[in-house]
Amino acid sequence: MVAPKIRIKLRGFDHKALDQSASKIVDTVRRTGADVSGPVPLPTRIRRFTVLRSPFKYKDSREHFEIRTHNRLVDIMNPTKKTIDSLMTLDLPTGVDIEIKTVGGRA
């Protein structure tokens, strides 16, 4: 049977806060004795918006804005009860979205 695995996806606009959160998660998992893979940087999603500067005329004058969404992936192999408890109490900075999935079955 496949060993249990926890997959954590981190998303955020600030890559420094994202890397800091990923390193906190990796340190916590290693302290509890589970194996960790990552953080793996996933492709950054760039959303661009073009807006007219003037409300009435001067269509040639436009402004460009963009939002960059950075992504990281952390896999935890063979998590223990202690690992899950320590991840639940972990304090992470605001602005980081966390998605946690369990992959695989119980051994």
UniProtKB/Swiss-Prot annotation:
Which is a GO BP term held by this UniProt record?
translation
Question: Keywords on this record?
Answer: Ribonucleoprotein, Ribosomal protein
| Gene3D superfamilies membership | Ribosomal protein S10 domain (3.30.70.600)
Pfam families from the UniProt entry: Ribosomal_S10
- State whether it acts alone or in a complex, and with which partners, per the record: Part of the 30S ribosomal subunit.
Q: What does this protein do?
A: Involved in the binding of tRNA to the ribosomes.
Protein family according to the UniProt entry: Belongs to the universal ribosomal protein uS10 family.
Q: What is this protein called?
A: Small ribosomal subunit protein uS10
The organism of origin for this protein = Deinococcus geothermalis (strain DSM 11300 / CIP 105573 / AG-3a)
Please spell out the taxonomic lineage of the organism that makes this protein.
Bacteria, Thermotogati, Deinococcota, Deinococci, Deinococcales
Q: Which gene name belongs to this protein? A: rpsJ
